[in-house]
Design a protein with these regions (language model features):
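Bacterial N-terminal signal peptides
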Residues: 7-19
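Extracytoplasmic copper-binding redox domains, predominantly the cupredoxin/blue-copper superfamily
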Residues: 23-263
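Positively charged n-region of N-terminal signal peptides that target proteins for export
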Residues: 1-7
Length: 263
């Protein structure tokens, strides 16, 4: 009897996964790429502590702006959808999210700091997800965690080979969560949390995919640690008609300047 029940619940879990996957496949897949017009010179970090460890393999390169020399693709740009309006705080409408994608299984994300940098430096997550911060380095770090909406903030020492599970699950936040290390002040990480599934982070070639998007006109927002694409004008995103099985967008050249600044 116990085996039958176990098999029954396993089948239910599998069916839930298949349903969620089918819902994602039913909508439109948005594919795009974020690039820079020129590949910037890789900057070196000014290391002020633990130089023997942080610089043991040579100068420590900044990870703030990562651009692939060949494709000019920009890594760590978070791309998401929002309503086609200019109302600050409006998020993707819940009634437009397919039922199977409204309450996904929570994911536990991991941020490590093996080489005097947070890895990954930029993270996109969904409300309900959790976070573990690890320290696989041979030196101590500290985790200065500041969440601007839910007040979940702390500053804790993280010894060698230790890990810290953030107590509360993420809540949706229109401002990025900031993580830093007071011992090594150049270290930084950013987390954006959404209450819908229509977001992505660009890969090493600046490419991204957002699956299962309902048809309609949605605004696409591009955000990098350095700011929004097109500055303050880009906060509300750029109107895009979504339809069909796949929508291939033209590459977006990342630019932090406002339209007025270009006149």
């Amino acid at each position: 009897m116990r085996m039958l029940l176990k098999s029954f619940f396993s089948i239910l879990a599998l069916m839930a996964c298949i349903t969620a996957s089918s819902a994602a496949d039913e909508g439109t897949i948005i594919k795009g790429q974020v690039i820079l017009d020129k590949v910037p010179k890789v900057e070196e970090v000014v290391v002020t502590a633990d130089k023997a460890v942080c610089c043991k393999d040579g100068p420590l390169a900044s990870t703030q702006m990562l651009v692939d020399p060949k494709s000019k693709g920009v890594k760590n740009v978070i791309v998401w959808l929002r309503p086609n309006d200019k109302i600050r705080g409006n998020e993707f409408p819940k009634d437009k999210i397919p039922e199977a994608l409204r309450k996904p299984k929570a994911v536990t994300h991991i941020i490590d700091q093996p080489k005097c940098q947070f890895e990954p430096r930029v993270l996109a997550a969904r409300a309900g997800d959790k976070l573990i911060v690890k320290n696989s380095a041979s030196i101590a770090h500290n985790v200065n965690f500041a969440s601007p909406i839910d007040g979940q903030s702390f500053n804790k020492l993280l010894q060698v080979n230790a890990e810290l599970a953030v107590e509360n699950a993420f809540t949706a936040n229109r401002f990025p969560i900031a993580i830093s290390c007071n011992i090594h002040p150049w270290m930084a990480a950013r987390i954006r949390v959404f209450d819908h599934p229509f977001y992505a982070t660009t890969d090493a070639n600046g490419k991204f995919e957002i699956k299962g998007v309902p048809e309609g006109t949605w605004n696409i927002v591009y955000w990098h640690e350095g700011g929004f694409h097109m500055g303050i004008d880009g906060i509300y995103g750029f109107a895009t008609e979504v339809k069909g099985k796949t929508l291939e967008l033209k590459p977006v050249t990342l630019d932090f300047a406002k339209k007025e600044d270009k006149k």
